[in-house]
A protein has these predicted regions:
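Membrane-interface loop-to-helix entry segments
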Residues: 145-160, 232-251, 286
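N-terminal transmembrane-helix/juxtamembrane module of multi-pass inner/ER membrane proteins
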Residues: 3-6, 10-65, 85, 89-160
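Membrane-interfacial catalytic/cofactor-binding modules of polytopic membrane enzymes
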Residues: 192-257
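Interfacial segments of alpha-helical transmembrane regions
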Residues: 88-95, 161-197, 263
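Aromatic-anchored segments of alpha-helical transmembrane domains
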Residues: 39-47, 98-101, 187-195, 267-276
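Membrane-interfacial alpha-helical segments at the cytosolic side of multi-pass membrane proteins
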Residues: 162-169, 242-260, 290-301
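Interfacial helix-loop-helix junctions of multi-pass membrane proteins
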Residues: 201, 236, 269-295
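Transmembrane alpha-helix/helix-exit interface in multi-pass inner-membrane proteins
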Residues: 103-119, 186-212
């Protein structure tokens, strides 16, 4: 495919975005439907299964606060004239809500399936590989390699908004909406996966299997801080890290091609880092990549359906 054809394909997809459903003066786009729908879904889930969740009242209050914050951002965003402020308000609100929903999703993992499914993952990987990959990889651990893997794992937090800025300031608001919608939907699909097939993760399920410590420098310290202070048990399959990294990489390919090539070694290393560093099993990472690919493929059709619904609503009104 020629560069012109690739650009045209990206423009066609970006052109799907921008339709707004106005509710009480607030314009909702496709990404907003995903975020607000997820907030409502988790609130309903917590109400129904509150007996199986620790401190459900606190989670409901947090969801209410997040909802007010997000709706407030939707109210103020169109009134901003400065492009930088518009970017930070829009992107910051979506990405903050995704991060907060991840923390809430971790608390709801065992409400349907009541036990961790790590033994099933271990059995599958033993049958496929003959070894447990996360344990087998210990023979390759060195401080420099650990530091690089930790860099790839944590720099994702910078790429997340950074790529959004590149897309926005080079291509405009509609391509940014494509990026944000796909990120939001991928996150939510991963969160649902946590409940359908809850997996504790190798670090929590079998810590005794790891006899070689993960030593490195600054990024290793940063990564371990995230593991011990932000991550909780679970949140494993599909791997949100691999899923979101795939979305970022493919969106770079669609809108900012030089960034796609520049990110290649980082994203490929990130995939490996998730199980090399014992955050995930190899299976989690593969499922995360496949989840992102599926979401990317179906997103244009979903946005088209959103647009049709908005137009029907406008006609009926």
């Amino acid at each position: 495919m020629s560069r012109r054809s690739r650009d045209a394909a990206g423009d066609r997809i970006a052109g799907l975005y921008g339709e707004r459903l106005f509710v009480l003066g607030v314009g909702l786009q496709a990404a907003d439907a995903v975020i607000l729908g997820a907030l409502f879904f988790f609130a309903l889930l917590i109400l129904v299964f509150q007996g199986r969740i620790t401190a459900p009242g606190g989670l409901l209050l947090r969801l209410a606060g997040l909802s007010l914050f997000y709706i407030g951002s939707l109210y103020f965003h169109p009134r901003l004239k400065n492009r930088v402020l518009r970017f930070f308000v829009r992107t910051g609100a979506v990405q903050l809500l995704c991060a907060q929903l991840f923390l809430i999703a971790q608390r709801t993992q065992l409400i349907v399936v009541r036990s961790w499914q790590d033994p099933a993952v271990l059995k599958l990987e033993a049958a496929v590989f003959g070894v447990q990959p996360t344990v087998w990889l210990q023979k390759f651990i060195t401080p420099p390699l650990t530091e690089w893997m930790m860099f790839a794992y944590v720099i994702y937090l910078i790429i997340y908004p950074g790529l959004g800025a590149l897309i926005y300031f080079r291509k405009g608001e509609r391509p940014l909406e494509d990026y944000l919608f796909t990120l939001a939907l991928t996150n939510v699909v991963c969160f649902l996966g946590f409940m359908v097939f809850p997996v504790a993760g190798p670090f929590y399920h079998m810590p005794e299997a790891y006899t070689v410590p993960l030593k490195g420098g600054f990024f290793a310290v940063w990564g371990e801080y995230i593991r011990r202070n932000i991550h909780e048990i679970g949140g494993t399959i599909p791997s949100p890290h691999c899923a979101i990294a795939t979305v970022m990489w493919m969106m770079a390919h669609r809108y900012v091609r030089p960034a796609f090539y520049a990110l290649a070694p980082v994203i490929l290393s990130l995939y490996v880092s998730t199980f090399f560093l014992r955050y995930h099993y190899l299976t989690d990472s593969v499922v995360g990549v496949l989840t992102a690919i599926l979401v990317i493929l179906v997103s244009p059709a979903l946005v088209g359906a959103w647009n049709s619904a908005v137009r029907r609503k406008g006609t009926s009104a």
